[in-house]
Swiss-Prot record:
Pathway: Carbohydrate degradation; glycolysis; pyruvate from D-glyceraldehyde 3-phosphate: step 1/5
PROSITE patterns: GAPDH (PS00071)
Database matches in NCBIfam families: GAPDH-I
Protein name: Glyceraldehyde-3-phosphate dehydrogenase 1
Gene Ontology MF: a single term: NAD binding
Keywords of the record: Cytoplasm, Glycolysis, NAD, Oxidoreductase
Residues annotated as site: Activates thiol group during catalysis: H176
Positions of NAD(+) binding: R11, I12, D32, R77, N313
Disulfide bonds: none
Reactions catalysed: D-glyceraldehyde 3-phosphate + phosphate + NAD(+) = (2R)-3-phospho-glyceroyl phosphate + NADH + H(+)
Major localisation: cytoplasm
GO biological process: canonical glycolysis; gluconeogenesis; glyceraldehyde-3-phosphate metabolic process; glycolytic process
A cellular component term, taken from the record's GO annotations: Z disc
Length: 332
């Protein structure tokens, strides 16, 4: 399997490394100009949300050593200066949140990377959601996007519903856990004034492009979905509320049956299904993109339904980054 590099050792960067270890993928290099190797060891070892790393991690001779495997550490601010080739890294995960366009992310190619996977939505890079549109990938693509955690939750569910019952139109709300871009106390936040309010004190209405992005990965739904977010004071796990008008009438039990069928078949490991009395903490470190909550959804009539699906917005997403890379490697 080709070797992986990670640019940006933040929440997603560190969890992509954990996911890579779980899935037997090889990470050979990490770049982060803001933390040295000893700090990397500390941040990787201890995680307030997902718990202590269960393997071994140490700093040795300037390397980050995880489970006995040496990982080269770079400290470059400009991606063009990262010598990925020297570490053998061919697939680079761009997880700084800064270099999210083809132009900016392509600078990794100068250092020897062959492919770049942006762990965020992109304005112009082709977007992929595992279980939904991987067949649109072609080996000539140098820079791709793994979309957002919310799009990864919504798209598999929307695909099942649209394939079986036809989505005429719909609105999505994600009740979303706090992320690093928010403020611990009230502060300035550019043009997005509400986003600057204290994360621990407030339910904050916010914009999200996640629903519209589904139209990019499922062209049949282009223009049929939009949505918004509420940021809430929890550290992790979010939940999508998808309210849709259907073209083909169906009982809620029929909808549940199709989702459960998909969760055991073509979308196994991507879309989960539960009929238990769950709450958000039950999904900490869950590796699915989306877990349909059969008991939480409701229908007004046979063509108007509200569907609920949970996601670990950090770890589920990080696992999909590795899955996308593995798929790309199988085709390149």
């Amino acid at each position: 399997m080709s070797k992986i590099g990670i640019n940006g050792f933040g929440r997603i960067g560190r969890l992509v490394l954990r996911a890579a270890i779980d899935k037997g993928a090889s990470v050979v290099a990490v770049n982060d100009p803001f933390i040295d190797v000893n700090y990397m060891v500390y941040l990787f070892k201890f995680d307030s949300t997902h718990g202590r790393f269960k393997g071994t991690v140490a700093a040795e001779g300037g390397f980050l050593v995880v489970n006995g495997q040496k990982i080269t550490v770079f400290s470059e601010r400009d991606p063009a200066n990262i010598n990925w080739a020297s570490a053998g890294a061919e697939y680079v995960v761009e997880s700084t949140g800064v270099f999210t366009t083809i132009d900016k992310a392509s600078t990794h190619l100068k250092g020897g990377a062959k492919k770049v996977i942006i762990s965020a939505p992109s304005a112009d890079a082709p977007m992929f959601v595992c279980g939904v549109n991987l067949d649109a990938y072609s080996p000539d693509m140098k820079v791709v996007s793994n979309a957002s955690c919310t799009t990864n939750c919504l798209a598999p569910l929307a695909k099942v519903i649209n394939d079986n019952f036809e989505i005429v139109e719909g609105l999505m709300t994600t009740v979303h856990a706090t992320t690093a871009t928010q403020k611990t106390v009230d502060g300035p936040s550019g043009k997005l004034w509400r986003d600057g309010r204290g994360a621990a004190q407030n339910i904050i209405p916010a914009a999200t492009g996640a629903a519209k992005a589904v139209g990019k990965v499922i062209p049949a739904l282009n223009g049929k979905l939009t949505g918004m977010a509420f940021r809430v004071p929890t550290p992790n796990v979010s939940v999508v509320d998808l309210t849709v008008r259907l073209g083909k009438g169906a009982t809620y039990d029929e909808i549940k049956a199709k989702v459960e069928e998909a969760s055991k078949g073509p979308l196994k490991g991507i879309l989960g299904y539960t009929d238990e009395e769950v709450v958000s903490t039950d999904f900490f470190s869950d590796t699915h993109s989306s877990v349909f909550d059969a008991k939480a959804g409701i229908s007004l009539n046979d063509k108007f339904v509200k569907l609920i699906s949970w996601y670990d917005n950090e770890f589920g997403y990080s696992n999909r980054v590795i899955d996308l890379i593995k798929y790309m490697q199988s085709k390149d």
